[in-house]
């Protein structure tokens, strides 16, 4: 649980704007299909893997359109080189985790973590992006897709506990800056 008091999120809100700039999030001009809904109220972060490598966020967008969705289902996509791409706008209801699409931020990492590992640069970006979302939305909980749905995603080499610890450390580091 990442409750309000624990990291002094109020103080952190002031530095968040600069912190988000550092993340250098890339925006793509997606062509959205019908049915994009606003009104996402994030309380959770849900982590995913793309299950394959060398996929751009545009390719994922096209794949998700072909599934009959309005476009890329995730709010963020992190490539192996650590670059963060915006998917859906944060206020858009996601299409990434059944039962959690209306109250979460979906973050997907490029790769298949059943048989490969998160790159150092991906981990770095993931930790910072997660910390930023926690500060922004006072996120209560972060979990892997498999924690909320019957799936292998985000894979056995995605260590949710390690990531939660790194994010907690990052929030503490930010407070002490």
Which positions does each model-derived feature cover?
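Flexible, solvent-exposed short loops/turns enriched in glycine
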Residues: 94, 98-101
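Basic/polar, cationic surfaces and motifs that engage anionic cell-wall
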Residues: 1-43, 83-84, 89, 103, ...
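Conserved beta-strand segments of the P-loop GTPase G domain that flank and frequently precede/overlap
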Residues: 48, 108-109
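Secreted/periplasmic proteins that engage bacterial cell-wall peptidoglycan
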Residues: 33-90
């Amino acid at each position: 649980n990442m409750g309000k008091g624990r990291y002094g999120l109020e103080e952190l809100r002031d530095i968040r704007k600069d912190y988000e700039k550092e993340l250098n999030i890339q925006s793509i001009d997606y062509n959205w299909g019908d049915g994009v809904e606003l009104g996402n109220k994030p309380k959770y972060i849900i982590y995913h893997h793309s299950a394959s490598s060398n996929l751009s966020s545009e390719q994922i967008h096209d794949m998700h359109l072909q599934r009959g969705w309005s476009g890329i289902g995730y709010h963020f996509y992190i490539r192996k080189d650590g670059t963060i791409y915006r998917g859906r706008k944060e206020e858009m209801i996601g299409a990434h985790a059944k039962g959690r699409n209306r109250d979460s931020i979906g973050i997907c990492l490029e790769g298949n973590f059943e048989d490969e590992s998160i790159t150092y640069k991906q981990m770095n970006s993931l930790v910072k992006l997660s910390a930023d979302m926690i500060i922004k939305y006072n996120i209560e909980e972060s979990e892997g897709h498999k924690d909320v749905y019957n799936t292998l995603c985000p894979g056995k080499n995605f260590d949710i506990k390690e990531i939660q610890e790194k994010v907690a450390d990052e929030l503490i580091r930010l407070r002490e800056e």
